Amino acid sequence: MSHHDGSKPYQPRRGPERPPPPAPADDAAAHVAPTVDHLAAVAAEAEAMARFEEEHRALGAEEEYEEEEDELEEEEEEMEEDEDAQHHEGVGGEVAVPMDAEAAAQLDPHGGMLAASGAVQPMASNQLTLSFQGEVYVFDSVSPDKVQAVLLLLGGRELNPGLGSGASSSAPYSKRLNFPHRVASLMRFREKRKERNFDKKIRYSVRKEVALRMQRNRGQFTSSKPKGDEATSELTASDGSPNWGSVEGRPPSAAECHHCGINAKATPMMRRGPDGPRTLCNACGLMWANKGMLRDLSKAPPTPIQVVASVNDGNGSAAAPTTEQEIPAPATVNGHESST
């Protein structure tokens, strides 16, 4: 190949190098997705942990509240038992609350002993506690002779020989009640229990309406059923037949069927008809209920002759039916008897 200048072969010009094409959005999203998922998982886990901690705290608070209520109930039962025991022994039931040193120093020992008319309960070997009108007086280093003098002065009760030497058996109980916040909690619990047990109200208006509609006799609920002779008269019709309609609260039945004229005693039961309830016999009522029409009396079978047995002088012999009772009456044609 020949060249125009004969020095070097022809080389085409190269343009500026183009930047590489940007990465597609899907690839970027693919790189970001794991990070987003990880952050979402961490946030969900943190939220679950926070919810679990909150539920755990609520459950712990509820259990603590229940335990406090149980403990208050036990303390109240023990307090009542101790009060009953002290009452039987002739000592008033009081809550022994020891006073601090300053308050005890300000009190006059003689004035406190003379003003106190409550119980005497030693808390320690040489400690005297007096309670009067809600105020508690505590005296330290009291000899048994002084306690004996106070008891004789107040109620004439002698001191037991071993009272000064031994400690009281109710010391743990009184020690537990020495804390004011426990006493306050116990009082709040008593108030709450009193409202819970004795504050009864009608929760539903239906109960109130039913109670207002019911009959009363001297404030007591009474039955609406009749009593005595009134019940007997209402259960019996004017003709002596049982009036079952009055028993069931329904209108009384008719004395005979309004269609065929059969007596109410000769049918198993009276049924509803066009004239109202208990106006048709059993057969007519069934026809009316099933087909909506009254039965044809011309096709009805003849009524069987009833044989009436009469007892002669109580010997149990029944009289045989007569010929007239066995043979039915001859049929009439146009109001005249047919000739034989």
UniProtKB/Swiss-Prot annotation:
Induction: By abscisic acid (ABA), and drought and salt stresses. Down-regulated by jasmonate and wounding.
Entry-linked InterPro entries: CCT_domain, TIFY-like, Tify_dom, Znf_GATA, Znf_NHR/GATA
Domain of life (superkingdom): Eukaryota
Compartments where located: Nucleus
Compositional bias per record (Low complexity), positions renumbered to this chain: 25-47
GO cellular component assignments: nucleus
GO biological process per UniProt: regulation of DNA-templated transcription
SMART domains named among the record's database cross-references: TIFY, ZnF_GATA
Domain Tify: 121-156
Residue span, CCT domain: 182-224
Ranges annotated as GATA-type zinc finger: 257-284
Keyword Nucleus: yes
Molecular function in Gene Ontology: sequence-specific DNA binding; zinc ion binding
Acidic residues: bias regions: 61-84
One Pfam family recorded for the sequence: CCT
Chief location: nucleus
Function: Transcriptional activator that specifically binds 5'-GATA-3' or 5'-GAT-3' motifs within gene promoters.
PANTHER family: GATA TRANSCRIPTION FACTOR 28 (PTHR46125:SF27)
Family recorded in the similarity comment: Belongs to the type IV zinc-finger family. Class C subfamily.
Protein name per its UniProtKB record: GATA transcription factor 20
Species whose genome carries this gene: Oryza sativa subsp. japonica (Rice)
